[in-house]
């Protein structure tokens, strides 16, 4: 059949199309608009999936040859290496892992290289997971939901990752509403969910995507995996962040007494389990408000701990 866009006719060979997800892990069937434009790009890897659409569902098909966005691996800082050690110490053989993007994921992936029979069920598949599969740390043999394959909603990383994923039967992709469903996540035992944050306040609220209304990333599946991991038998959820960041040459604490007005919470305090910085790892579940505050202050950079204690008293969080 053929489709036309702007007078250009594009021919295809099959009536049924096997589709990758879009940038948010969504499939064609989730869109209800009148116009559904499919893009064919030879640089996109073929990703194994059972989610297909009939050609009649598409308004038109466009061919293009755009290079994919490549995100380089960053060398983890000593702080991130310390964080990865704390997380690895809490990880058992056979754990089913979920990680995000960036240097935290690289560090955690390196820290898991002494673990065996790991599984993967993650919103995003990245380079650190690819390395664990290549090394044999990931076998997916202990997964009970989608066993035998590393499952995800989308890929993001380097060119090496895209080339490795192309026609790779070790991988399986599914729409994000299914991949990120906490009840599906919990079908695997010993889920290890590792997500990052920009800031966390003294009661355990997490901000991971925005500061004072400025959006730095999408919300993604953080809350889904935080909940799904804790519903999993033996599962653990980690919010990991370095204790500080530097802006314009000045050091700031990532553990704050309160968020600035206009900052929106990504994960509520009632859902947060483990919090990790380079100074330690604490489990906030079942802690009183005072215990939470003291536990989180212990994770802060030493230069800010006294100030945080004073602010906690000022706000009525400590006597």
Where would I find each of the regions flagged by the language model?
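Conserved alpha/beta enzyme-core scaffold
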Residues: 1-319
């Amino acid at each position: 059949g053929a489709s036309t866009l702007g007078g250009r006719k594009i021919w295809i060979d099959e009536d049924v199309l096997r589709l990758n997800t879009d940038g948010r892990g969504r499939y064609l069937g989730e869109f209800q608009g009148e116009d559904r434009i499919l893009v064919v790009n030879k640089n996109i890897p073929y990703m194994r999936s059972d989610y297909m659409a009939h050609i009649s569902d598409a308004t038109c098909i466009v061919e293009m040859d755009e290079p994919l966005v490549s995100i380089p691996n960053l060398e983890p800082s000593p702080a991130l290496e310390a964080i990865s050690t704390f997380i690895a110490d809490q990880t058992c053989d056979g754990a089913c892992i979920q990680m995000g993007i960036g240097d935290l994921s690289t560090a955690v992936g390196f820290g898991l290289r002494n673990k065996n029979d790991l599984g993967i069920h993650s919103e995003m598949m990245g380079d650190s997971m690819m390395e664990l599969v290549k090394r044999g740390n990931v076998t997916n043999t202990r997964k009970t939901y989608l066993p035998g394959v590393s499952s995800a909603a989308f890929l993001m990383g380097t060119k090496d990752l895209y080339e490795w994923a192309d026609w790779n039967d070790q991988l399986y992709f599914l729409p994000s509403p299914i991949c990120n469903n906490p009840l599906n996540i919990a079908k695997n035992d010993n889920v290890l969910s590792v997500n990052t944050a920009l800031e966390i306040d003294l009661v355990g609220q997490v901000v991971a995507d925005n500061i004072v209304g400025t959006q730095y990333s999408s919300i993604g599946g953080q809350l889904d995996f935080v909940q799904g991991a804790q519903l999993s038998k033996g599962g653990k959820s980690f919010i990991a962040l370095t204790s500080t960041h530097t802006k314009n040459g000045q050091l700031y604490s990532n553990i704050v007494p309160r968020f600035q007005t206009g900052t929106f919470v990504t994960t509520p305090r009632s859902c947060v389990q483990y919090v990790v910085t380079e100074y330690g790892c604490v489990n906030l579940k079942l802690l009183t408000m005072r215990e939470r505050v003291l536990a989180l202050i212990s994770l802060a950079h030493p230069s800010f701990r006294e100030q945080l204690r004073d602010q906690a008293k000022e706000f009525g969080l400590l006597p």
